[in-house]
C-alpha cells in the first residue's frame, strides 16, 4: 500500500484474464474502480495515506488522493484526466477520494463520491478529459484545531436520493434538485433506472448496468 506505482487489471467476469495494466506516479493506494454505466470508462481512486491525512489543501498536488479517469478502447486503458474535489480543505480535515457510485442519467456519466471531511462531490465525467463538479456538500472540519478522522466514508445514489455515511456525525440523505447542470427530466430518469438483468435490488459494488423505462411504459 505504500508504493506510488500500482498495477491494476481488468477482468472478464466468467473467464478472468488480465487485459491491461496501468501506473500513476501520483497514486499511493489504489482503492477502488468504478465503471460508467456502459462500461466504456473507469474511475480509479487513490486513498492516499489510508484516508487519515489532509491531502486536499490548496498546495497539495492535484494527483494526490484523487481520481484517475480512463477510457476503455479496444480492451486497453487510455488515461484521460485526474479529478480532485476543487474546494481547498483545512489541515485539520482528512480528505482524499473514497467510495462513490454512478448516478444513472441517460447519455451522461455522473459520479457522486465521498471525500471524507472534504464532503461529497458530484462529478460529470461525460467528457473524460474535462471532468467538472456539478454539485457538492461540505460540513467543514469536525474540530478546527485538531485533525481527527471523520467525514464521508461513502456516498451512494439510490432511486432519487444520495446516502452519505458520515463517520462521526451519522447518516445524511440528499435529494438532487434541478440546476444549470441537471434538468428535472434527467433527475427523474435517474430515479427510474433499474438493473438490465435480475431483481430490482442495489449493491454499489456489483456495478450492474442500468436501463430506463421506455416512453409511455409508466
What are these regions (language model features)?
Residues 17-20, 78-80, 131-134, 182:
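A structural motif specific to WD40 beta-propellers
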Residues 41-132:
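Loop/turn-rich, solvent-exposed surfaces of beta-rich toroidal or solenoidal domains
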Residues 23-29, 82-98, 130-157, 194:
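Conserved blade-ending motifs and adjacent loop-strand segments that build the rim/top face
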Residues 31-38, 48, 94-107, 151-158, ...:
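Structural signature of eukaryotic scaffold interfaces centered on beta-propeller domains
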Residues 145-218:
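Blade-level signature of beta-propeller repeat domains, shared across WD40, Kelch, NHL, RCC1
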Residues 1-12:
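Single conserved hydrophobic/aromatic residue that forms the stacking wall/gate
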Residues 26-29, 50-53, 90, 119-121, ...:
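Flexible loop/turn segments at secondary-structure boundaries
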